[in-house]
Amino acid sequence: MARPRPKHIGIVACSAEGAALCYRTICDEAPALMGRHQHPEISMHTYCLGEYMEHVYCDDWQGVADLMLSSADKLAKAGADFLISPDNTIHHALEFVVPRSPLPWLHIVDEVAAVAKSRGYRKLAITGTKITMEGTVYQKKLLAAGFEYAVPDAAARARIDEVIFDELVNGIFTEESRTYLQQVIGRMSHQGCDAVVLGCTEIPLLIDDISSPLPTLDSTRILARAALQRALE
């Protein structure tokens, strides 16, 4: 009996680095579940990062949502069955997207929280853009799921944001920035955190379980694996 065809994954991309890591994770890990050279059908659409950031910097989340919905419409027409976005920051607009979306979404924070719970973590350090660290997307969902959380101090939040937008999204990865993130995460381990959320989809390209003072929750790869599992259901 032929195996049912996997669901078609639609990726609403934002930055090239995060989207590429998500796509590669799905394609790299699918063969272990599906067989050699196999992966679900995947379509991706992205407006340029600059278009998104014009709205983000103005706190115009409806504008961000409109871009995401435009991508969603294109992916629905391409045959996608559900959607993901490997970008934590633009998830702040998802509440405006979901009610008008032609397709269902996997939420990156829901998937991170599920993995954190399965590993028995209780208090999570949140790293990412300033918007992610200072906003409510992770904070509300983590509290609702029963977690405590902590974020870096104001100076560290500003520096991490600079690293992300001046370096990581442009494919620049330096030892200086890696060392800085290690120091920040190390300080948060002393605040009782038992794992760190890599809450920017480019941070896993700089920090991983080997280099991090705390166990990592790699939001990019977690979302990719959740999408792969959903496609195979």
Give each language-model segment a name:
Residues 1-233:
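Non-catalytic structural scaffold of enzyme domains
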